[in-house]
Amino acid sequence: MPEAKTRSKRGSTRTNMLMSAAQVMRERGASGVTIDEVLARSGAPRGSVYYHFPEGRNQILAEALRWAGDAITESIDTAAERGALPLVRNFSEFWERTLMESDFGAGCPVVAAAIGCTNDEAQLTAIASDIFCRWRDALARAFVADNFDTAAAESLAVTCIASLEGAVVLCRSIRTTEPLRQVAREMEFLIKSREFVRRNGLPTGGH
C-alpha cells in the first residue's frame, strides 16, 4: 500500500495548496495570492509548486478559484432542492458564518477574482463568470420549481445574488453582519411579494 499512501499524500498536498490559495484570494484578492504565501499557509515544500502546478501561479489561481466555486456551488445545489427561500437563507447564513469565523477578513473569492484581477490574470474573469452563471441557474431552477415563470425566476435569481454579494462587501467594510441580515430579510419579502402577485395579480385600484 505504500504507493496508495503516496498518491493520497500528493493529493492532500495539492488540495491544501488550493485551499490556501483560495483563502488568500478571499482576504486579499487575486493579486494578493503569491507562491510564497501559498507555501507558508499550506506547509508544502517549494518543489511541490511545479510538480502539482507546472504552469505556476496562474494555474494555482485558476484552479483555486474553480475549487472554491465548486465548493460553494455544491452547497447551493443542495439547498436549492428545498426551494428558493431556503436557498437564499442558506446563502446568507453561509456568508455570515464565513465573515464571523474570519473576523471579517474573508469575503467571496469569486467576487475578488471578478473585479480584482490584472491583465495577466484575465482568465479568472471568465472562470468567475461561469461560477456566477451556475449560481444564477441553480437559484433560477429553485424559483421555477416554486412555480415562477422563467423570466421572473432568472430576474429574482440575479437580484438575490447581486444583493447578497454586495452585502458581503459592505459587511467586511463596516465589520458587522447586519447588512447581510437586512438584505436577506428584504429578499425574503420580495420573494413572498412576487409570489403573492403571481397568485393573485396586481391590485387594479379602488377599495
What is each residue range found by the language model?
Residues 1-12, 195-207:
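N-terminal intrinsically disordered/low-complexity leader segments
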Residues 16, 20, 24-63:
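Helix-turn-helix
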Residues 65-71:
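Short, basic, alpha-helical segments at the C-terminal edge of helix-turn-helix-like DNA-binding modules
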Residues 75-106, 156-160:
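Hydrophobic alpha-helical connector segments
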Residues 87-90, 101-126:
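Amphipathic alpha-helical segments used for helix-helix packing
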Residues 98-101, 141, 161-179, 191-199:
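Amphipathic C-terminal alpha-helical segment
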Residues 109-112, 151-170, 182, 186-189:
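Hydrophobic alpha-helical segments that form the core
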Residues 120-122, 132-157, 194-200:
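Hydrophobic alpha-helical bundle segments that form small-molecule/ligand-binding pockets
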